[in-house]
């Protein structure tokens, strides 16, 4: 399934870095740091990185999810400060990425470096019906760890 997403280039330097799928099977689109100069994240530090881009999904049946790049997280401890970013369909502002250095070494974020992935996902908006009791299920109220040993 393909949808068309409106995008604004807020910083002309990003015109050469429009998000694109790397392969036919790619789910995520890389987002890049729109920085004038390198920013060094010390261990434990967070920094809100601009991307120089804005999107408008318009259709409430979709949202965008911002996720960490696996290599940055595994090799350098760089993840998203909010763990997952959610871009609602009606948001039209600049995409920004909260980076968090959970590693033990300083990490330099360079201008135009790939810093996160964006995945467009379907959304179901639920309506809630208040009830006094649920119809029974095999799980019942079993929570954390109730279905296995780990």
Curated annotation (Swiss-Prot):
GO terms for molecular function: dUTP diphosphatase activity; magnesium ion binding. Pathway: Pyrimidine metabolism; dUMP biosynthesis; dUMP from dCTP (dUTP route): step 2/2. It catalyses: dUTP + H2O = dUMP + diphosphate + H(+). Its cofactor is Mg(2+). Belongs to the dUTPase family. This enzyme is involved in nucleotide metabolism: it produces dUMP, the immediate precursor of thymidine nucleotides and it decreases the intracellular concentration of dUTP so that uracil cannot be incorporated into DNA. This is Deoxyuridine 5'-triphosphate nucleotidohydrolase. It comes from Neisseria gonorrhoeae (strain ATCC 700825 / FA 1090). The gene is dut.
């Amino acid at each position: 399934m393909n949808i068309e997403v409106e995008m604004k280039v807020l910083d002309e330097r990003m015109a050469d870095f429009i998000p694109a799928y790397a392969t036919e099977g790619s789910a995520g689109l890389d987002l890049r740091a729109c920085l004038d100069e390198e920013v060094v994240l010390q261990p434990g530090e967070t920094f809100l990185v601009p991307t120089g881009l804005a999107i408008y999904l318009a259709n409430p049946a979709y949202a965008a999810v911002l996720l960490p790049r696996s290599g940055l997280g595994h090799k350098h401890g760089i993840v998203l400060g909010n763990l997952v970013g959610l871009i609602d369909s009606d948001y039209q502002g600049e995409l920004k990425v909260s980076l968090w250095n959970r590693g033990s070494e300083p990490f330099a974020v360079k201008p135009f470096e790939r810093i996160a992935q964006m995945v467009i996902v379907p959304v179901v908006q639920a309506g809630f019906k208040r009830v006094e009791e649920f119809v029974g299920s095999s799980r019942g109220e079993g929570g954390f760890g109730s279905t296995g040993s780990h």
